[in-house]
Amino acid sequence: MLVLGLETSCDETGVALYDSERGLLADALFSQIDLHRAYGGVVPELASRDHVKRMLPLIRQVLDEAGCVPTEIDAIAYTAGPGLVGALLVGASCAQALAFAWGIPALGVHHMEGHLLAPMLEKTPPQFPFVALLVSGGHTQLVQVDGIGQYTLLGESLDDAAGEAFDKTAKMMGLNYPGGPEIARLAEKGVAGRYTFPRPMCDRPGLMFSFSGLKTSALNTWQQSVSAGDDSEQARCDIALAFQQAVVETLTIKCKRALKQAGMKRLVIAGGVSANKALRTSLEKMLGDMKGDVFYARPEFCTDNGAMIAYAGCQRLQAGQHESLAISVQARWPMEQLSPL
């Protein structure tokens, strides 16, 4: 089955072609980072308008790269949520219109299920069951995965997601958008031990997260440094390192607890923050000590992309899942509501 995947949940337009027998044939992505940088964050209306502008040219590009024509496509998968409603509607309406014109089915895909299954596109994919850490700008969740659509939520953030905390902390220190990569870049030049931040909710049992207090601690530390006359690049680097260490250690501690609770030794990390090198190193060491395995997607598939949507959609379409031509998207959509395959 040849599936065209469309991703428009936020600020990246992703298109890909996935074949159930030949694998990923082509993918293309346009990031709106430069468009939103001047505003310090994503502007929903601008995001939607840019998706409209980019979608069809990217589809043509992917078809050309794969050497395919529309008549060869068996189905279209598109992100139906969660995400920005306006942005989601661009992808959904495009997918349904093309599906109607080409006489093929279209299927809405859960954005975070796409992220969760992205490591399946690698040469050594994880086997079910496993524990997944979904960590991005909008989500921080620990999920027990027994199969596609068989998800048990083990823990999640009570406030800010980890990626959101990265971005907000970076913005408070006057760093460029997006803040996560900026924090990671500065942390590489930071001096360890100059600052120490709390590991939120690690002093109590359970698998819930909270990053708003950590963000406030970083803000207070930065303001105190500025008040003392030190707003140097090195001060930013040292705070960035301490902040990143706190987030990484918190995520690592919770992942270890989740694995023990589930009785598993396989961990999948997915979402934009999973590209963070310090997080990967920490989790690899933890799984190594447990004699377990950790899996993640290649860096370009950690952030939003069409390939993960095409793959996730293909799995459900092959299982016989279909939907009507009605255009329906959801800004919020718990993964536990998905039907199992």
Curated annotation (Swiss-Prot):
GO BP, one annotated term: tRNA threonylcarbamoyladenosine modification
Q: Which SUPFAM superfamilies match?
A: Actin-like ATPase domain (SSF53067)
What compartments host this protein? Cytoplasm
- In this chain, substrate is annotated as bound at 134-138, 167, 180, 276
Q: Which coarse location class describes where this protein primarily resides?
A: cytoplasm
Reactions this protein catalyses? L-threonylcarbamoyladenylate + adenosine(37) in tRNA = N(6)-L-threonylcarbamoyladenosine(37) in tRNA + AMP + H(+)
GO cellular component annotations of the record: cytoplasm
This enzyme's EC code(s): 2.3.1.234
Names of required cofactors: Fe(2+)
Residue numbers binding Fe cation: 111, 115, 304
Q: Which UniProt keywords apply?
A: Acyltransferase, Cytoplasm, Iron, Metal-binding, Transferase, tRNA processing
Q: Give a Pfam family name.
A: TsaD
A Gene Ontology molecular-function term?
N(6)-L-threonylcarbamoyladenine synthase activity
Q: State how the cofactor is bound.
A: Binds 1 Fe(2+) ion per subunit.
In the record, the note on similarity to other proteins reads: Belongs to the KAE1 / TsaD family.
Its function?
Answer: Required for the formation of a threonylcarbamoyl group on adenosine at position 37 (t(6)A37) in tRNAs that read codons beginning with adenine. Is involved in the transfer of the threonylcarbamoyl moiety of threonylcarbamoyl-AMP (TC-AMP) to the N6 group of A37, together with TsaE and TsaB. TsaD likely plays a direct catalytic role in this reaction.
Protein name, per record? tRNA N6-adenosine threonylcarbamoyltransferase
Species, as recorded: Pseudomonas fluorescens (strain SBW25)
